[in-house]
Structures are given as structure tokens and as C-alpha cells.
């Protein structure tokens, strides 16, 4: 169940449309990976052809899709709060907890609990529902996959897929760019 908190009626309408885009594109992305179509995986996660992080990326993509379909998610308006004022151009953010246990780089910061709260700044999307859907996916990759913000630059994301696939698989921006390939 997806809810919205603190948005205007026009913003709510854009968010509802963005969630529809998010659901459709997420299902396509998951289906592509599960069927073995690695075209966009190679662009955004591993251009070496070794597919070293295919299982990890596929797991995160599946977990994001599962969360979209079955977990309580609240998108809350972060417009005007202290973090949004400090971080000019902020699109969204989430809060994670440090994992005290042993784990890999993906499990150092984790989401706990069944519900998720994701803060969104709708004004930075300029009314573009596809861009907003990609931001939602980006933030969900943090929540369910433990991804990090290594780079937002599109060319660096692609270069990491070619030269350092581990960085690409860990970077949240690569996930929303991957999702963008499935938005029509």
C-alpha cells in the first residue's frame, strides 16, 4: 500500500501518476533480468560481460519490485525542511540504520521494519512524472538494497559499469537509470 503525506492536490496527482509509471517499469525491469535479457544490465551495471554482480543486482531489483507491490510505503513531502534547504536541488532521501553485524558493502546500512518512509521534494522534478518515478526507485534502492550515492553523473555511472562494476552495482543512481530504460 502506497500513501502520500503532506503534498498538495496537484502534487498528489503527479505522485499517483509517478507510482503507476514506477510499478509498470519496475515489473518490466524485473522481468527482463529474470528472463535473461541483460541488455540494460550491461549498460548500467556490468559492461565487462563478466556479469559479476548479476545476482546482487537482480536481488535488489526483485526486492524493490516486491516492496512496491506488497509493503507499506509512505512518500512524504520534504519541501522546505532543513535538509532540503541545506542540499540545493535535493530530489529525495531516506533514513537508514547502521547494521552492527557482519556483512558486505551492501548491508552496512539497512532499513528495518515493514513500512518505509521516503522523503521527496516534488519541485525538483519540474512536473516530470517519469523523473519522479526514477527518484522513487533510487530511494527504494537505498531502503531495500543498501545502495549508496557514489555519483549522480550519467557518464560516470556508465563508466563505472565498464571499469568498476562493483561501484555501479552499489550506486543508487545506476538503479534509477536502469529503471529509466523500461519507462515508455
Features from the language model and the residues they span:
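Predominantly extracellular/secreted Zn2+-dependent metalloproteases
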Residues: 1-133, 143-184
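Walker B catalytic acidic pair
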Residues: 139
Amino acid at each position: 500500500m502506497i500513501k502520500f503525506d503532506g503534498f498538495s492536490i496537484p502534487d498528489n496527482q503527479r505522485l499517483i501518476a509517478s507510482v503507476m509509471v514506477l510499478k509498470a517499469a519496475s515489473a518490466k525491469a524485473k522481468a527482463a533480468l529474470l528472463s535473461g535479457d541483460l541488455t540494460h544490465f550491461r549498460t548500467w551495471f556490468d559492461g565487462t560481460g563478466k556479469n559479476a554482480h548479476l545476482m546482487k543486482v537482480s536481488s535488489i531489483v526483485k526486492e524493490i519490485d516486491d516492496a512496491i507491490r506488497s509493503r507499506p510505503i509512505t512518500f512524504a513531502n520534504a519541501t522546505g525542511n532543513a535538509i532540503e534547504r541545506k542540499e540545493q536541488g535535493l530530489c529525495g532521501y531516506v533514513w537508514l540504520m547502521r547494521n552492527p553485524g557482519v556483512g558486505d558493502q551492501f548491508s552496512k546500512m539497512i532499513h528495518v521494519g515493514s513500512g518505509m518512509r521516503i522523503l521527496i521534494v516534488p519541485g525538483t522534478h519540474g512536473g516530470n512524472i517519469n523523473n519522479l518515478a526514477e527518484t522513487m526507485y533510487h530511494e527504494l534502492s537505498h531502503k531495500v538494497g543498501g545502495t549508496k550515492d557514489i555519483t549522480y553523473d550519467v557518464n560516470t555511472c556508465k563508466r563505472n559499469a565498464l571499469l568498476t562494476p562493483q561501484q555501479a552495482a552499489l550506486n543508487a543512481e545506476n538503479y534509477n537509470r536502469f529503471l529509466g530504460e523500461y519507462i515508455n
